[in-house]
């Protein structure tokens, strides 16, 4: 989708370097951009806003995930400068601040798979609670849950 939107702007070589995958968390998009395309980050951000109609903000991930809270540095490249959004997954709603806590929508299938393994009466310890996604998904069952 992104490569198609930029086909008249980027050269074929630049298009090949473009990372076509991005994370969409509510109305926020987080995109990785190779160093060779940093000078075109605003154009890439604008193209994403135009392609993803519910998106209001596009951030460039300018650092890898790091630190105790596994956060990443984000730089606004298009849209509104807000890092908090509502995210929906498996009939649950979450308010997530993508700048303050690690969150990956790519793990939704894994969170659902693991939560389906939990049986009533079990004790579950979630050692890496983050924003609480896994814990809230499993809280629908009758068990003891500790989130750290």
Task: Say what each PLM segment does.
Residues 1-148:
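SAM-dependent transferase fold signal centered on methyltransferase-like domains
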